[in-house]
């Protein structure tokens, strides 16, 4: 029964954060949505920040599971990176909570939201880093600083998918994959 209440609270808080954002969500709202007393929330979470942390932690696990679900071991590393990043960015752009948090950070600059979004990005980079380390050990890509490579890979992908489209025709998946392959495997042309 206690586990059910905890789950109800987390689901209600996720809904509230998705609808109203972090700053506008109150524990009273969460209690109403979860159909529990406000005190019940505090038996599981000491404050709103701890509840938010739980939700973001679950979100990161969901994102990693999404990324893992598209990996095809028979494909080259660069194609799997492309598939993985496509899935992660799709998740981020379609998940209501992520949309609201990105919007809140942009419009209000809420510190707690900025920190959690940075945490999500750090987790994605850590995930990519593990995959890059495996690819290096298999000789699929040349050795290098895996943390920097992971960071650049994520930022380059976001730039090609989102930023490029502001002033240019959108790139096809094949074009994005080719650009990433050039930079990841062959490096910058002379």
Q: Each predicted region: which residue ranges?
A:
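Key DNA-contact positions within bacterial/archaeal DNA-binding proteins
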Residues: 39
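Short coil/turn segments at alpha/beta junctions that flank glycine-rich nucleotide-binding fingerprints
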Residues: 19-23, 74, 95, 138-139
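Hydrophobic alpha-helical connector segments
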Residues: 54, 68-94, 149-153, 177
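Short secondary-structure transition hinges
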Residues: 89-129
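Basic, helix-initiating cap at the start of DNA-binding domains
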Residues: 1-20, 24-36, 49-53, 62
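Base-recognition residues in the alpha-helical recognition helix of bacterial helix-turn-helix
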Residues: 18, 42-46, 58
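C-terminal peripheral helix-coil segments that are non-catalytic and often amphipathic
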Residues: 83, 87-90, 126, 130-138, ...
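Amphipathic alpha-helical packing segments from all-alpha helical-bundle domains
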Residues: 61-64, 68, 112-138, 147-151, ...
């Amino acid at each position: 029964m206690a586990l059910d209440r905890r789950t109800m609270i987390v689901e209600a808080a996720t809904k509230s954060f998705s609808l109203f954002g972090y700053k506008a969500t109150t524990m009273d709202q969460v209690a109403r949505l979860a159909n529990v007393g406000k005190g019940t929330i505090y038996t599981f979470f000491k404050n709103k920040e701890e509840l938010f942390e739980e939700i973001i932690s679950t979100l990161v696990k969901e994102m990693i599971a999404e990324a893992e679900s598209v990996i095809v071991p028979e494909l080259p590393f660069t194609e799997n990176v492309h598939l993985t990043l496509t899935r992660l960015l799709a998740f981020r752009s379609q998940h209501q909570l992520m949309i609201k948090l990105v919007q809140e950070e942009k419009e209000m600059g809420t510190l707690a939201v900025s920190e959690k979004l940075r945490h999500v990005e750090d987790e994605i980079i850590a995930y990519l880093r593990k995959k890059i380390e495996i690819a290096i050990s298999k000789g699929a890509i040349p050795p290098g600083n895996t943390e920097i490579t992971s960071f650049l890979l994520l930022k380059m992908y976001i730039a090609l998918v989102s930023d490029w489209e502001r002033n240019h025709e959108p790139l096809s998946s094949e074009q994005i994959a080719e650009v990433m392959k050039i930079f990841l495997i062959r490096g910058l042309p002379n």
